[in-house]
Curated annotation (Swiss-Prot):
Keywords: Repeat, Seed storage protein, Signal, Storage protein. Residues 1-21 form the signal peptide. Interacts with OP10 (via N-terminus). One of its GO terms (molecular function) is nutrient reservoir activity. Zeins are major seed storage proteins. The alpha zeins of 19 kDa and 22 kDa account for 70% of the total zein fraction. They are encoded by a large multigene family. Belongs to the zein family. This is Zein-alpha 19C2. InterPro entries: Maize_Zein_Storage, Zein. PANTHER family: ZEIN-ALPHA 19C2, ZEIN-ALPHA A20-RELATED.
Length: 240
């Protein structure tokens, strides 16, 4: 008998709980709305308009509020990871907007040193990879300067001679091919040495020197082969 009475009491209590219970649909906004703090913006109220827009509008509300939310809300929200990602993205964008102008100002202020660093970057890499090659690169301008200086030292007497005595410098220029010929062909240079008095005699008279230049092949032929030169003279006399 006691068991039946206890069973009836249990059924009565269960029926009372069922009668007083409120069933919330899965897409209903009532559980979330009841957990939202009262100080959030009024945009939260518009979430209940359409359940399909619940996650999107909730993200907008969180981004606009920038206020810590209740832990129960995050437990009830199905878009927890998406909301957290959105909040982190918004904070990163805000930080970027604050920091980017400062970076631009620093870059503009230090544009010249930055440009110089970019120009010297290959040399720095070369010095790290191959110190010997980097040292040669550093000495290259000095090598070029030494070569140019050596050439200037060789030409210095001629330059001084040209400044002090233009006539003597002109004679040096006339005799320069003979000096080169002496270095290349000694026999031809000896022949030229035999003709040197004629060059010195007619150096002051360009017209006579030009005639001598025209007669030079015949003179060289006379020195190297007198018989052939004599035949040339006979043939020339017969023609004229």
């Amino acid at each position: 008998m006691a068991t039946k009475i206890f069973s009836l009491l249990m059924l009565l209590a269960l029926s009372t709980c069922v009668a007083n219970a409120t069933i919330f649909p899965q897409c209903s906004q009532a559980p979330i709305a009841s957990l939202l703090p009262p100080y959030l913006p009024s945009i939260i109220a518009s979430i209940c308009e359409n359940p399909a827009l619940q996650p999107y509008r909730l993200q907008q509300a969180i981004a606009a509020s920038n206020i810590p939310l209740s832990p129960l809300l995050f437990q009830q929200s199905p878009a927890l990871s998406l909301v957290q990602s959105l909040v982190q993205t918004i904070r990163a964008q805000q930080l970027q907007q604050l920091v980017l102008p400062l970076i631009n100002q620093v870059a503009l202020a230090n544009l010249s040193p930055y440009s110089q660093q970019q120009q010297f970057l290959p040399f720095n890499q070369l010095s790290t990879l191959n110190p010997a090659a980097y040292l040669q690169q550093q000495l290259l301008p000095f090598s070029q300067l030494a070569t140019a200086y050596s050439q200037q030292q060789q030409l210095l007497p001629f330059n001084q001679l040209a400044a002090l005595n233009p006539a003597a410098y002109l004679q040096q220029q006339i005799l320069l091919p003979f000096s080169q010929l002496a270095a290349a062909n000694r026999a031809s240079f000896l022949t030229q040495q035999q003709l040197l008095p004629f060059y010195q005699q007619f150096a002051a008279n360009p017209a006579t020197l030009l005639q001598l230049q025209q007669l030079l092949p015949f003179v060289q032929l006379a020195l190297t082969d007198p018989a052939a030169s004599y035949q040339q003279h006979i043939i020339g006399g017969a023609l004229f």
